[in-house]
Protein backbone atom coordinates (compact mmCIF):
# COMPACT_ATOMS: atom_id res chain seq x y z
CA UNK A 1 0.00 0.00 0.00
CA UNK A 2 2.83 2.40 0.83
CA UNK A 3 4.36 1.71 -2.58
CA UNK A 4 1.06 2.56 -4.30
CA UNK A 5 0.76 5.81 -2.35
CA UNK A 6 4.30 6.85 -3.27
CA UNK A 7 3.37 6.32 -6.93
CA UNK A 8 -0.08 7.98 -6.85
CA UNK A 9 0.84 11.20 -5.03
CA UNK A 10 3.59 12.35 -7.44
CA UNK A 11 1.37 11.31 -10.37
CA UNK A 12 -1.49 13.41 -9.01
CA UNK A 13 0.77 16.41 -8.47
CA UNK A 14 2.17 16.17 -12.01
CA UNK A 15 -1.33 15.80 -13.49
CA UNK A 16 -2.63 18.88 -11.65
CA UNK A 17 0.37 20.98 -12.68
CA UNK A 18 0.12 19.94 -16.32
CA UNK A 19 -3.65 20.41 -16.51
CA UNK A 20 -3.97 23.73 -14.66
CA UNK A 21 -0.68 25.45 -15.48
CA UNK A 22 -0.03 24.26 -19.05
CA UNK A 23 -3.21 22.92 -20.68
CA UNK A 24 -5.72 25.41 -19.18
CA UNK A 25 -4.07 28.74 -20.13
CA UNK A 26 -3.22 27.55 -23.63
CA UNK A 27 -6.74 26.24 -24.25
CA UNK A 28 -8.32 29.46 -22.86
CA UNK A 29 -6.37 31.59 -25.34
CA UNK A 30 -6.88 29.26 -28.31
CA UNK A 31 -10.59 28.73 -27.68
CA UNK A 32 -11.19 32.46 -27.14
CA UNK A 33 -9.51 33.24 -30.47
CA UNK A 34 -11.42 30.44 -32.20
CA UNK A 35 -14.81 31.47 -30.81
CA UNK A 36 -14.26 35.17 -31.56
CA UNK A 37 -13.32 34.42 -35.17
CA UNK A 38 -16.41 32.23 -35.34
CA UNK A 39 -18.66 34.93 -33.86
CA UNK A 40 -17.29 37.60 -36.20
CA UNK A 41 -18.03 35.41 -39.22
CA UNK A 42 -14.38 34.91 -40.21
CA UNK A 43 -14.64 31.12 -40.05
CA UNK A 44 -17.83 31.16 -42.15
CA UNK A 45 -16.01 33.05 -44.91
CA UNK A 46 -12.97 30.76 -44.61
CA UNK A 47 -15.13 27.64 -44.92
CA UNK A 48 -16.94 29.11 -47.95
CA UNK A 49 -13.58 29.91 -49.56
CA UNK A 50 -12.01 26.50 -48.92
CA UNK A 51 -14.98 24.24 -49.68
CA UNK A 52 -14.65 24.31 -53.53
CA UNK A 53 -10.90 23.67 -53.22
CA UNK A 54 -11.34 20.69 -50.87
CA UNK A 55 -14.25 19.04 -52.72
CA UNK A 56 -11.94 16.83 -54.86
CA UNK A 57 -10.54 15.36 -51.63
CA UNK A 58 -14.04 14.23 -50.60
CA UNK A 59 -14.55 17.03 -48.07
CA UNK A 60 -17.65 19.20 -47.63
CA UNK A 61 -17.99 22.62 -45.99
CA UNK A 62 -18.75 21.16 -42.58
CA UNK A 63 -15.76 18.81 -42.91
CA UNK A 64 -13.60 21.89 -43.42
CA UNK A 65 -14.92 23.24 -40.13
CA UNK A 66 -14.09 19.91 -38.46
CA UNK A 67 -10.47 20.31 -39.63
CA UNK A 68 -10.31 23.75 -38.01
CA UNK A 69 -11.80 22.35 -34.80
CA UNK A 70 -9.33 19.49 -34.40
CA UNK A 71 -6.41 21.83 -35.16
CA UNK A 72 -7.40 24.66 -32.83
CA UNK A 73 -9.79 23.25 -30.18
CA UNK A 74 -9.36 19.54 -29.35
CA UNK A 75 -9.68 16.05 -30.82
CA UNK A 76 -13.23 15.71 -29.43
CA UNK A 77 -14.60 18.96 -30.90
CA UNK A 78 -15.23 17.53 -34.41
CA UNK A 79 -17.59 14.91 -32.93
CA UNK A 80 -20.36 17.52 -32.85
CA UNK A 81 -19.65 18.48 -36.47
CA UNK A 82 -19.65 14.83 -37.60
CA UNK A 83 -23.00 14.39 -35.84
CA UNK A 84 -24.32 17.49 -37.63
CA UNK A 85 -23.10 16.15 -40.99
CA UNK A 86 -24.84 12.85 -40.33
CA UNK A 87 -28.12 14.53 -39.35
CA UNK A 88 -28.09 16.82 -42.38
CA UNK A 89 -27.78 13.96 -44.87
CA UNK A 90 -24.08 13.84 -45.75
CA UNK A 91 -23.31 10.61 -47.63
CA UNK A 92 -21.47 7.74 -45.95
CA UNK A 93 -18.57 8.24 -48.34
CA UNK A 94 -18.14 11.91 -47.39
CA UNK A 95 -18.51 11.00 -43.70
CA UNK A 96 -15.68 8.48 -44.02
CA UNK A 97 -13.47 11.11 -45.66
CA UNK A 98 -14.15 13.66 -42.92
CA UNK A 99 -13.65 11.04 -40.18
CA UNK A 100 -10.32 9.96 -41.72
CA UNK A 101 -9.13 13.55 -42.02
CA UNK A 102 -9.85 14.26 -38.34
CA UNK A 103 -8.09 11.07 -37.22
CA UNK A 104 -4.96 11.93 -39.21
CA UNK A 105 -4.56 15.57 -38.17
CA UNK A 106 -2.67 17.00 -35.20
CA UNK A 107 -4.94 17.55 -32.20
CA UNK A 108 -4.80 20.99 -30.57
CA UNK A 109 -5.10 19.69 -27.00
CA UNK A 110 -1.73 17.95 -27.45
CA UNK A 111 0.07 20.09 -30.06
CA UNK A 112 -0.19 23.48 -28.35
CA UNK A 113 0.79 22.32 -24.82
CA UNK A 114 3.75 20.45 -26.35
CA UNK A 115 4.83 23.77 -27.86
CA UNK A 116 5.89 24.71 -24.33
CA UNK A 117 8.25 21.70 -24.39
CA UNK A 118 9.93 22.63 -27.67
CA UNK A 119 7.51 21.38 -30.35
CA UNK A 120 7.49 23.56 -33.49
CA UNK A 121 3.73 24.04 -33.68
CA UNK A 122 3.37 25.82 -37.05
CA UNK A 123 5.25 23.16 -39.07
CA UNK A 124 3.25 20.49 -37.25
CA UNK A 125 -0.03 22.17 -38.27
CA UNK A 126 1.13 22.58 -41.87
CA UNK A 127 2.19 18.94 -42.24
CA UNK A 128 -0.99 17.94 -40.39
CA UNK A 129 -3.15 19.59 -43.06
CA UNK A 130 -1.34 17.71 -45.84
CA UNK A 131 -1.72 14.42 -43.96
CA UNK A 132 -5.41 15.11 -43.36
CA UNK A 133 -6.03 15.76 -47.06
CA UNK A 134 -4.27 12.53 -48.02
CA UNK A 135 -6.29 10.62 -45.41
CA UNK A 136 -9.55 12.05 -46.75
CA UNK A 137 -8.57 11.24 -50.35
CA UNK A 138 -7.65 7.63 -49.52
CA UNK A 139 -10.87 7.14 -47.54
CA UNK A 140 -13.06 8.72 -50.24
CA UNK A 141 -11.45 7.42 -53.45
CA UNK A 142 -10.02 4.06 -52.31
CA UNK A 143 -11.01 2.59 -48.94
CA UNK A 144 -14.55 3.98 -49.04
CA UNK A 145 -15.32 3.75 -52.75
CA UNK A 146 -17.95 1.09 -52.06
CA UNK A 147 -19.88 3.33 -49.66
CA UNK A 148 -23.00 5.24 -50.66
CA UNK A 149 -22.41 8.65 -52.27
CA UNK A 150 -26.07 9.64 -52.15
CA UNK A 151 -26.63 12.95 -50.37
CA UNK A 152 -29.64 14.99 -49.36
CA UNK A 153 -29.73 18.74 -50.05
CA UNK A 154 -27.16 19.90 -47.51
CA UNK A 155 -27.38 22.90 -45.21
CA UNK A 156 -23.71 23.85 -44.86
CA UNK A 157 -24.28 26.90 -42.64
CA UNK A 158 -22.83 26.95 -39.13
CA UNK A 159 -25.01 27.90 -36.18
CA UNK A 160 -23.06 29.93 -33.61
CA UNK A 161 -23.33 33.06 -31.42
CA UNK A 162 -22.65 36.46 -32.99
CA UNK A 163 -20.51 39.15 -31.30
CA UNK A 164 -21.86 42.51 -32.49
CA UNK A 165 -20.77 44.66 -29.53
CA UNK A 166 -18.44 44.69 -26.51
CA UNK A 167 -20.86 42.66 -24.38
CA UNK A 168 -21.10 40.03 -27.09
CA UNK A 169 -17.31 39.77 -27.20
CA UNK A 170 -17.12 39.35 -23.41
CA UNK A 171 -19.84 36.68 -23.52
CA UNK A 172 -17.96 34.75 -26.21
CA UNK A 173 -14.71 34.89 -24.21
CA UNK A 174 -16.49 33.77 -21.03
CA UNK A 175 -18.06 30.80 -22.83
CA UNK A 176 -14.69 29.89 -24.36
CA UNK A 177 -13.05 30.11 -20.92
CA UNK A 178 -15.67 27.82 -19.41
CA UNK A 179 -15.20 25.35 -22.28
CA UNK A 180 -11.41 25.41 -21.80
CA UNK A 181 -11.84 24.85 -18.06
CA UNK A 182 -14.02 21.80 -18.72
CA UNK A 183 -11.41 20.39 -21.11
CA UNK A 184 -8.58 20.93 -18.61
CA UNK A 185 -10.45 19.54 -15.61
CA UNK A 186 -11.76 16.51 -17.51
CA UNK A 187 -8.17 15.67 -18.46
CA UNK A 188 -7.04 15.28 -14.83
CA UNK A 189 -8.45 11.76 -14.13
CA UNK A 190 -6.92 10.29 -17.29
CA UNK A 191 -3.60 12.00 -16.55
CA UNK A 192 -3.50 10.69 -12.97
CA UNK A 193 -4.43 7.13 -13.94
CA UNK A 194 -2.05 6.99 -16.91
CA UNK A 195 0.89 8.42 -14.95
CA UNK A 196 0.20 5.99 -12.09
CA UNK A 197 -0.06 2.95 -14.38
CA UNK A 198 3.01 3.90 -16.40
CA UNK A 199 5.09 4.53 -13.26
CA UNK A 200 3.99 1.17 -11.84
CA UNK A 201 4.84 -0.62 -15.10
CA UNK A 202 8.19 1.09 -15.22
CA UNK A 203 9.04 0.08 -11.65
CA UNK A 204 7.92 -3.48 -12.39
CA UNK A 205 10.28 -3.64 -15.37
CA UNK A 206 7.55 -4.05 -18.01
CA UNK A 207 8.54 -0.96 -20.01
CA UNK A 208 12.18 -2.02 -20.07
CA UNK A 209 11.17 -5.51 -21.22
CA UNK A 210 9.10 -4.02 -24.06
CA UNK A 211 11.97 -1.73 -25.01
CA UNK A 212 14.34 -4.71 -25.15
CA UNK A 213 11.84 -6.62 -27.31
CA UNK A 214 11.76 -3.73 -29.83
CA UNK A 215 15.44 -2.95 -30.42
CA UNK A 216 14.73 -1.31 -33.80
CA UNK A 217 12.67 1.46 -32.14
CA UNK A 218 14.18 4.42 -30.27
CA UNK A 219 13.89 3.44 -26.56
CA UNK A 220 12.64 6.93 -25.64
CA UNK A 221 9.71 6.54 -28.07
CA UNK A 222 8.33 3.30 -26.60
CA UNK A 223 6.75 4.73 -23.45
CA UNK A 224 4.99 7.75 -25.05
CA UNK A 225 3.79 5.62 -27.98
CA UNK A 226 2.34 2.84 -25.80
CA UNK A 227 0.63 5.43 -23.59
CA UNK A 228 -0.70 7.37 -26.57
CA UNK A 229 -2.27 4.44 -28.41
CA UNK A 230 -3.80 2.88 -25.29
CA UNK A 231 -4.84 5.94 -23.27
CA UNK A 232 -4.94 8.81 -25.76
CA UNK A 233 -3.14 12.06 -26.52
CA UNK A 234 -3.80 13.71 -23.17
CA UNK A 235 -2.21 10.80 -21.30
CA UNK A 236 0.73 10.88 -23.72
CA UNK A 237 1.10 14.58 -22.97
CA UNK A 238 1.62 13.77 -19.30
CA UNK A 239 4.30 11.17 -20.07
CA UNK A 240 6.14 13.44 -22.52
CA UNK A 241 6.04 16.30 -20.00
CA UNK A 242 7.60 14.04 -17.35
CA UNK A 243 10.28 12.79 -19.76
CA UNK A 244 11.14 16.34 -20.83
CA UNK A 245 11.43 17.50 -17.21
CA UNK A 246 13.80 14.65 -16.36
CA UNK A 247 15.93 15.17 -19.47
CA UNK A 248 14.97 11.88 -21.16
CA UNK A 249 13.33 13.61 -24.14
CA UNK A 250 14.73 16.44 -26.27
CA UNK A 251 12.90 18.97 -28.42
CA UNK A 252 14.53 17.45 -31.52
CA UNK A 253 13.13 14.01 -30.67
CA UNK A 254 9.70 15.49 -30.00
CA UNK A 255 9.62 17.20 -33.40
CA UNK A 256 10.86 14.06 -35.17
CA UNK A 257 8.07 11.95 -33.62
CA UNK A 258 5.28 14.52 -33.99
CA UNK A 259 3.68 12.68 -36.90
CA UNK A 260 3.55 9.43 -34.93
CA UNK A 261 2.39 10.81 -31.58
CA UNK A 262 0.13 13.80 -32.26
CA UNK A 263 -3.18 12.68 -33.80
CA UNK A 264 -6.49 11.21 -32.50
CA UNK A 265 -5.99 7.72 -34.00
CA UNK A 266 -5.95 5.84 -30.69
CA UNK A 267 -8.51 3.84 -28.73
CA UNK A 268 -10.09 6.80 -26.85
CA UNK A 269 -10.00 9.07 -29.92
CA UNK A 270 -11.72 6.61 -32.25
CA UNK A 271 -14.29 5.76 -29.56
CA UNK A 272 -15.19 9.42 -28.94
CA UNK A 273 -15.55 10.22 -32.64
CA UNK A 274 -17.53 7.04 -33.39
CA UNK A 275 -20.03 8.20 -30.77
CA UNK A 276 -21.02 11.04 -33.12
CA UNK A 277 -23.69 8.79 -34.63
CA UNK A 278 -24.51 5.32 -36.00
CA UNK A 279 -23.53 6.10 -39.59
CA UNK A 280 -20.24 7.62 -38.47
CA UNK A 281 -19.54 4.49 -36.42
CA UNK A 282 -20.25 2.26 -39.43
CA UNK A 283 -17.59 3.92 -41.60
CA UNK A 284 -14.74 3.57 -39.08
CA UNK A 285 -12.84 0.98 -41.17
CA UNK A 286 -12.29 3.11 -44.31
CA UNK A 287 -11.72 6.12 -42.05
CA UNK A 288 -8.97 4.34 -40.11
CA UNK A 289 -7.35 3.05 -43.32
CA UNK A 290 -7.31 6.56 -44.74
CA UNK A 291 -5.97 7.97 -41.48
CA UNK A 292 -3.12 5.44 -41.45
CA UNK A 293 -2.02 6.69 -44.87
CA UNK A 294 -2.13 10.30 -43.70
CA UNK A 295 -0.22 9.54 -40.49
CA UNK A 296 2.42 7.59 -42.42
CA UNK A 297 2.95 10.63 -44.66
CA UNK A 298 3.17 12.96 -41.64
CA UNK A 299 5.63 10.66 -39.88
CA UNK A 300 7.89 10.52 -42.93
CA UNK A 301 7.83 14.28 -43.49
CA UNK A 302 8.68 15.05 -39.85
CA UNK A 303 11.56 12.59 -39.87
CA UNK A 304 12.92 14.20 -43.05
CA UNK A 305 12.50 17.73 -41.66
CA UNK A 306 14.46 16.90 -38.51
PLM feature spans:
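N-terminal signal-anchor module of multipass membrane proteins
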Residues: 1-45, 303
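Intrinsically disordered, low-complexity non-transmembrane regions of multi-pass membrane transporters
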Residues: 1-6, 10, 144-178
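Hydrophobic mid-bilayer segments of alpha-helices in multi-pass membrane transport proteins
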Residues: 23-32, 127-136, 151-159, 187-196
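Transmembrane helical segments that form the transport core of multi-pass membrane transport proteins
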Residues: 30, 34-54, 169-243
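Membrane helical hairpin/interfacial module
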Residues: 38-47, 55-82
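Juxtamembrane inter-helical linkers in multi-pass membrane proteins
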Residues: 48-63, 150-169, 217-218
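A loop-to-helix transmembrane entry motif
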Residues: 63-71, 220-230, 255
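C-terminal transmembrane helix pair
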Residues: 78-141, 238-306
